[in-house]
């Protein structure tokens, strides 16, 4: 999803490359799309532009909270937004997401019915607003040799590696990074304590805050891209999204420096999170017609497979899976097994009061308060 060298190619190539080819854009056909950085194949946008004569203004983002703020403020300027299902559920309730016209989405039958059912159950009733794109989980990416060299008693495979202050103190000597994502870390911490990851009980957040305060001194950075620097031994332990763990492992192997990385996800019932990312159309979108065209295009099997092969994230497109590299589909970091998925939790839309409590817990954690 987030290999830094790819972002430059994507943002430049999607617009400049096509212009250099001398394409004349259809009059007034401009589509504004925002998505996580490095979360789409390099040629997906340019191929769409070439096929339909539509100019795409593609705007990568690196913070879910930032895109939420734009959407909630209104007049975001976007026609298509990539976002997490759990976040979209909140935006749907606020009237910020437009319902889909499924008569214009004949490729929707390619999406995995199990994922559609999960979405309808948890975040988008009747699948009225959201087109699934990728799905996955989170866990810990680590350098076993460096971990054991630094701390021979490290509990590899246990989330105590990142949530127990005694262990983390030792591992901090070789570098520990956390995702800069409260929507992942706070529920993960609740689950680690044996609490409901969707808890609405303030006492539970007090317990999480106390645990996080104890480990805060031993975290080097909060960075969603820290996994990219693990092959250089900047960190020995990082909480990551699963597919980024796979990217880190591959990057280390390609560097051929002797660094070997591995990944594990939280084990046990209700310990690991299942997330689903997808595409929505804001209610104030200026180009709804071409937004539907783009969503339908993204659900083509060959397009979905190309995106998955580039990002190494698990596509929600069932018909695309046979077209995806085996290195990706065979890795539990990218494609968790069905048995693992059965044990996972999904995050719920929490009452505003609890959301504020989560935000305060996260802010204090990062600040070391």
PLM regions with names:
Residues 1-12:
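Bacterial N-terminal signal peptides that target proteins for export
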Residues 20-26:
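Sec/Tat signal peptide C-region and signal peptidase I cleavage site
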Residues 27-91:
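Early extracytoplasmic/lumenal segment of secretory-pathway proteins
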Residues 89-135, 154, 160-163:
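Hinge/lid segment of periplasmic solute-binding proteins
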Residues 98-109, 160, 255-273, 282-284:
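Short beta-strand->loop
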Residues 174-189, 193-264:
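Ligand-binding pocket segment of bilobal, Venus flytrap-like solute-binding proteins
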Residues 277, 282-343:
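Mature extracytoplasmic/periplasmic domains
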Residues 338-369:
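Conserved C-terminal helix/tail region of periplasmic/extracytoplasmic solute-binding proteins
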């Amino acid at each position: 999803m987030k290999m830094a060298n790819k972002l430059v190619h994507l943002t430049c190539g999607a617009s400049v490359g096509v212009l250099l080819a001398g394409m004349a854009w259809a009059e007034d056909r401009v589509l504004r799309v925002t998505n996580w950085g490095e979360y789409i194949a390099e040629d997906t946008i340019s191929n769409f532009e070439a096929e339909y004569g539509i100019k795409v203004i593609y705007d990568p983002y690196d913070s879910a909270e930032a895109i939420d703020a734009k959407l909630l403020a209104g007049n975001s300027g976007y026609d298509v937004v990539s976002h997490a299902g759990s976040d979209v559920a909140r935006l749907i309730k606020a009237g910020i997401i437009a319902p889909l016209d499924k008569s214009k989405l004949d490729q929707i039958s390619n999406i995995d019915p199990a994922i559609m059912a999960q979405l309808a159950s948890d975040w988008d009733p009747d699948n009225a607003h959201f087109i699934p794109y990728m799905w996955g989980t989170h866990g810990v990416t680590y350098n076993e040799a460096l971990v054991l060299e630094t701390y021979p008693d490290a509990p590899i495979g246990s989330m105590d590696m990142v949530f127990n202050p005694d262990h983390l103190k030792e591992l901090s000597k070789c570098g520990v990074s956390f995702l800069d994502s409260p929507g992942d870390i706070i529920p993960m911490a609740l689950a680690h304590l044996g609490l409901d990851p969707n808890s609405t009980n303030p006492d539970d957040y007090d317990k999480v805050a106390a645990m996080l305060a104890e480990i805060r001194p031993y975290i080097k950075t909060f960075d969603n891209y820290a996994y990219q620097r693990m092959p250089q031994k900047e960190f020995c332990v990082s909480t990551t999204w699963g597919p980024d763990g796979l990217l880190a492992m591959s990057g280390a192997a390609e560097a051929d420096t002797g660094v070997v990385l591995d990944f594990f996800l939280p084990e046990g019932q209700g310990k690991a999170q299942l997330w689903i990312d997808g595409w929505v159309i804001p209610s104030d979108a200026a180009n709804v017609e071409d937004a539907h065209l783009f969503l339908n295009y993204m659900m083509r099997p060959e397009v979905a497979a190309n995106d998955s092969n580039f990002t190494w994230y698990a596509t929600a497109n069932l018909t695309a899976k046979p077209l995806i590299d085996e290195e990706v589909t065979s890795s539990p970091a990218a494609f968790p097994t069905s048995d693992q998925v059965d044990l996972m939790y999904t995050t719920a839309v929490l009452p505003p009061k609890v959301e504020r409590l989560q935000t305060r817990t996260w802010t204090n954690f990062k600040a070391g308060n």
